[in-house]
Amino acid sequence: MTTKERIISLMRQRVLILDGAMGTMIQSYNLTEEDYRGERFKDLPGLQKGNNDLLVISRPDVIGDIHRRYLEAGADIIETNSFSSQRISMEDYGACDYCHELNVSAARLARKYADDFTAKNPEKPRFVAGSIGPTNKTCSLSPDVNNPALRNITFDELASAYKDQIKALIEGGVDILLIETIFDTLNAKAALFAAREAMDEMSVELPVMLSVTVADKAGRTLSGQTLEAFVASIDHAGVMSVGLNCSFGAKDMKPFLESLASFAPYYISVYPNAGLPDEMGKYRQTPKEMAVQVQEFVDEGLVNIIGGCCGTTDKFIAEYEGIIRHDGTFKTPHVPVKRDHNLWLSGLESKRLLPGSNFMNIGERCNVAGSRKFLRLIKEKKYEEALTIARKQVEDGAQVLDINFDDGLLDAKEEMIHFLNLLTSDPDIARVPLMIDSSKWDVVMAGLKCVQGKCIVNSISLKEGEEKFLSHARELRKIGAATVVMAFDEVGQATSFERKIEICERAYKLLTEKVHFPPEDIIFDPNVLSIATGMAEHDRYALDFIEATGWIRKNLPYAHVSGGVSNLSFSFRGNNYVRAALNAVFLYHAIGEGMDMGIVNPSTSVTYDDIDKDQLKIFDDAIMYTSPEASQKLIELADKLLEEQNAGGGKSLTSNHNVAADAWRAESVEKRLAYALRKGITDHIEEDIKEALEKYPKAVDIIEGPLMDAMNEVGVLFGAGKMFLPQVVKTARTMKAAVAILQPVIEAQKKGGEDSKSSLPEILIATVKGDVHDIGKNIVATVLSCNNFNVIDLGVMTPPEKIVDAAKKENPAIVALSGLITPSLEEMTKDTALKIASVYSGPVAWTKDASQAAIVAEKLINPRTSAAYISELNELYARLREEHEQKEKNPTEISLEEARKRKLNLF
């Protein structure tokens, strides 16, 4: 029995117990800088206190004691102390060269204690999970507000670092690979890719656990994915379990856990924080209180593995033994949802193709071979305009977007990476799955490594033989993508019904039997070819495709059928109505035989029912090849309609704009600006700002009025979980565009004496010493920059003296400090009142999220609002300090009614 089989066997019998927080336990030992360094790391530069992973070498007695305490508390699985032991995170400490040694040592240390406890009680075997953290960088978000296409880490760089870590953990003897605290699915996919490569190279097979952290009340990751989209994105990897950790306490985590357990075909884990931090930043929830909440998960059959994250200790874990049993018998663990055979794709949101689903439209216009406009925009580097084509397709109903840059005058790989990085930064577009379309394999792989969702690849074929076909399929299996399979082999392209089904059947068997490719991820394209070309041998092409579609759906279980629909009518290019009508008739018949997706123009307005009955018969006859004369009749009809169209009396296709979508343009200028900011639309920002300048005497009033009002609304929506992070960043970019237009006017008015206000001043920002995570800081810096603040970024792990020196040198108006990776909590305002504001003479403000940062900063430095806002803050902090003192003297609860009266209203 393999390790995975043993663990699964146990999970079917009972809920397993994972250990608790490592960092919280380490803090209780009050270690010094010298403890962290020891003899081994005495020459490392910079501060090392807080680099917990070093302790497996410098203080193995401490880490070993923590392992022992968790095992004595009843943990079935203990984690290695290796959360940050890859070179990306260790770079901030100057400790990259020690990564291999740290991981091997961490694994061996945990292995020793686990084996000792297993030997004492073989009936309760203990397992070691290699802890693999998310790193302090993200593949899916740009670190530069002015360049949304920029990334400070690539998939390949992440995968390489992860592979080195994973191989060292395996060498050290771990039983499980635990990829945890996932905030960016693309990072997780790189870790899974690395795990697969490491295990293949070392000829081992270990179970993999995944644990994701949600970043907002809507239950999305920091990079914007829903939980269902996240699971779709990693579904290829064959992991043992999927779960949640960090983020919230058990109570707030429950709705997300219920959702995950309802659809994920995996065993489920959960290890929440010990409630929410109090006003002093401490976790006050007791072990028994948390156990009561976690017991609900167990009693309701939601989980298979329970543990603890931030704030938990061995005392918390010790409570779990009592909640997984009832009258001495183990409670029934979660039973994973039965896996189906439906195609499951994802962008920021999930897309399933279920039996009976409507036809899946794949937008065709972001293809340089199919859209001359798109090609021109790409050649001219007008990427924002090119993105509007993608956005328009999504608005018009495209459920997947085809992306193709195969053109002799383009660097297809470079363009694919650049455009996808831009596209995935736009949540209105990135919510749908993508089809990575190229005849060049390096371009396909480069595209897949830019996207956190599960894509479709267009395409693979047997054209270069079985070996290359299977090699490509294995790569797709490893990275996680569905694929289009063209009806093309070593002989050539299939044109007849017989050749189409011959090639498709052969490809299906190779994929399912030799690669174990999921049949639901196979999408056959039996070649949509042009009809009515004037060549008789082409006249059956549509009918052969339709008949092949029916055969595939009946004989190749769970496989799908797609095609490039516009190819059918290519001989009528220039005659838009005929092309649209012919395509509509073709789709009507092909869908009836089982074609369930296709590359189409989603803006096309002609449907089967729109076509004149007499014309419809001609189109039908040509598609279904009812007679040898059918194609000629279609050609004659096309000529007639084109003549009428040219004379102005015929039907023609025009841009089918969604009138409702543009209704906001009729609103007042204030409402238009607010709408544009909420939606991140820059198309009309210049004309709206010019109109606003006619209404507002001072340009700065537009910033302080409608623009800041809109940003405030965005903050409210974000706080309520009705907007998510990528949308906020997009909003901030629109704000920046608006301010950029206003800035010259502000300067001119200043010189003319109309306004004494200068442009908004500098803000110094840093992540505090002991925290290597710069993602939250970068998001705040992005929003501040977009609101016309000049941001000076000191980076991560910033010592106090460096911050003070920089503040003296730069003389910024505001110093902004970041020190939390988990979502900000309202309790932190009490921390500000009690521990920070009381020791500073200047004003100190707390903001609950990035979207509020610019609003608070502007209030602080604006002479019109500063005094009142600072007074408001001081009154608030004084009240909070008084309440805290009273609570300490007399710790009694207040009524719900009184609590509601005292609710915080900072903004």
Predicted features and spans:
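Domain-level signal for soluble alpha/beta catalytic cores
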Residues: M1-E885, F907
